[in-house]
A protein has these predicted regions:
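FMN-binding flavodoxin-like domain, especially the glycine-rich phosphate-binding loop
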Residues: 2, 7-109
Length: 109
């Protein structure tokens, strides 16, 4: 499953290209954040996040969604961010938000 947020469409395009290549489903964060869903990845299923970098960090809606979401553990989590030239503190901020959920093991690159 690939969760995405897109402001002008770039991240949406990336999410759909990834989903096509990985035979995965795409879930828009702007819609999913309104739901009270529990996400249960199947064994070995990847969980991805795609979003733009806003001010050298993930957009507020992405961090709010991570805090709100209920998810069972996943073996593999990744994120892809779109940006002009610099991701700033995005990796650190996103990783900290995910680690607080306690359901993902993060491995820095």
């Amino acid at each position: 499953m690939i969760f995405y947020f897109s402001g002008v469409g770039n991240s949406k395009w990336v999410a759909h290209k990834l989903a096509d290549a990985l035979h995965d489903k795409v879930l828009p964060i702007a819609e999913e954040i309104r739901k009270e869903a529990v996400y249960t990845p199947m064994k070995g299923e990847r969980v991805g996040f795609v979003f733009p970098v806003y001010g050298w960090e993930p957009p507020k809606i992405v961090l709010d969604f991570i805090r709100k979401m209920q998810m069972q553990a996943s073996d593999y989590l990744y994120f892809v961010c779109t940006c002009g030239d610099d991701t700033g503190k995005t990796n650190r901020i996103f990783t900290q938000a995910i680690e607080k959920k306690g359901v993902f093991n993060t491995h820095p690159l």
